Amino acid sequence: ARSQPAKIVMASFGAGTSSHFVGELFKNQAGISMLHVPYKGSAPMMQDLVGGQIPFAVDTSLAAAPQEKGGRIKVLAVSSPKRVANLPDTPTFAELGFQGFDLTAWGALVAPRGLPADVRNALVRALATAMATPAMREDLRKVGVDVLDEPPSAYEARVNRELPAMRALVVRAGMSVD
């Protein structure tokens, strides 16, 4: 990758997506150059990876784990701070020597700004109730999702904490969504 940067492809499931950010952070920390090839989604990217059309891709553990279990790909590392349940034998980037490598995609229930407080609170309570069920937590854990019981204020704090680092990575890597 250092000697022939334009020949090594790093595929993501779209420009500006979490997989693009993970790939750029890897390139930055490894000190290598690769050609970013953004796909229009995970499925076509995974199809090309399995088919041998691309040598390297960044995807979610949810998409990658079944392919690895089927012997079609090899997952090299996960970008979370700890190993994930659906790929328990796969090391983290930190375990491989990439310190401070903590970049995970997270999902949140969002609503329009100005949502009445009573409606917002009812949604938060309903989500917390659903996420607290053992069956829901186990189903999510099996596919590599860690459930965080965070109130809206913690979500806002997470966004405010992570956004500056993501903006800095965009600048450092010269990322573009074009």
Set out the residue ranges of the language-model regions.
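Hinge/capping helix and adjacent helix->loop/strand transition within the periplasmic-binding protein
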Residues: 1-44, 93, 106-139
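Alpha-to-beta junction loops
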Residues: 4-7, 30-32, 50-59, 72-75, ...
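Extracytoplasmic
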Residues: 5, 73, 104-106, 142, ...
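Generic preference for hydrophobic
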Residues: 10, 36, 58, 75-76, ...
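Short helices/loops that flank or line small-molecule/ion binding pockets
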Residues: 25, 29, 43-53, 62-70, ...
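An extracytoplasmic/periplasmic, membrane-proximal ligand-sensing/linker region
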Residues: 28-32, 69, 95, 117-178
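Short beta-strand and adjacent tight-turn residues that come in two discontinuous sequence segments
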Residues: 39, 58-59, 78, 103, ...
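C-terminal lobe and pocket-closing loops
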Residues: 64-132, 164
